[in-house]
Amino acid sequence: GPCNVVDGVAIDVNPSIYEAGIPVIAAGHDKATCAVKLPQFTDDIEAIKAAVKPFVFETCKAEANWNMTNFVNDQVELVRRQVGNRKVLLALSGGVDSSVVAALLLKAIGDNLVCVHVNHGLMRKGESEDVVEMFGNQLKANLIYVDATERFLTKLEGVEDPEQKRKIIGGEFIRVFEEEARKLDGIDFLGQGTIYPDIVESGTKTAKMVKSHHNVGGLPEDLQFELVEPLRQLFKDEVRACGVELGLPYEMVYRQPFPGPGLGVRCLGAITRDRLEAVRESDAILREEFRIAGLDKKVWQYFTVVPDFKSVGVRDNARSFEWPVIIRAVNTIDAMTATIEPVEWPILMKITDRILKEVKHVNRVCYDMSPKPNATIEWE
């Protein structure tokens, strides 16, 4: 139903309107009815603001007093109230969400934050090393490094279903944290970088489930921690603004998003180590060439996937039967919708040439042209 209802006012409306999948604002003002229907699939933030502004500020007499400084101060106070003098264990992947959560929790509780970086073997090339350097050496955070590569890959052997992979990875993450917590004294809370799109896409009473998110749907029933999720009200662009407000460096705040399950949802189907390596190496080439071309600051998210089937090709004047690599590059404002980035052909040709020459067991490169919707940003 509606998020807010005025006391004493009956809501005389067909309840199915709240399950229609279309954003709707409706209000009864005296005997007049005011409603705003927003464009369902658009990244035009200014158009959305123009549609909502008269209703919010003229009809409802709202005041424009929300800003990121106030949000940070409010969340710091809320975290202090929730946690007190106890300790929080944070899953620090080094991505935007977990980095901003770490900075916010450090501001709120200081040394009572214990950061754990788990290398599950599904990280991008050199990423775990970067996390240790940035957080352990530069930011001087209380950082514990856990190499759980063999543990995760063994659990994932033969698992094809993407939902099952996500739940295995999410559940194993929590169990690793539980084990680390037993080695420490007084860990009562688990910090998470859950943001608003995670909540929406994982399903609510009024939203159909799209996919389970690593921060939401993978938690096991025997979870022994109380959750601390200070970013759950924010969209991705607001998370970045929060990071800037907290003083994090540009390269950390504006790095491209990376899913919790990592390359596990980009090595499609059952994960094999050789195909996982093909994803990692092709992704590294794509990121390097996008940086050289200046696209790393223009494109919101870009990555490669390797499916669990092969294609016929020619290598060294002989028939080859090897994997394709699929490139995906999208732009979005809030991660709820996404458009395709029209990358220039010379750049794509250079990337293709490098992947075919440098990545083992690959004989074909494709470019994904599917927007969100109908496709999601990730393949799994």
Enumerate the language-model features and the residues they cover.
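RNA-binding accessory domains that recognize and position tRNA/RNA substrates
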Residues: 1-188, 197, 203-380
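Extended catalytic-interface subdomain
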Residues: 192-194
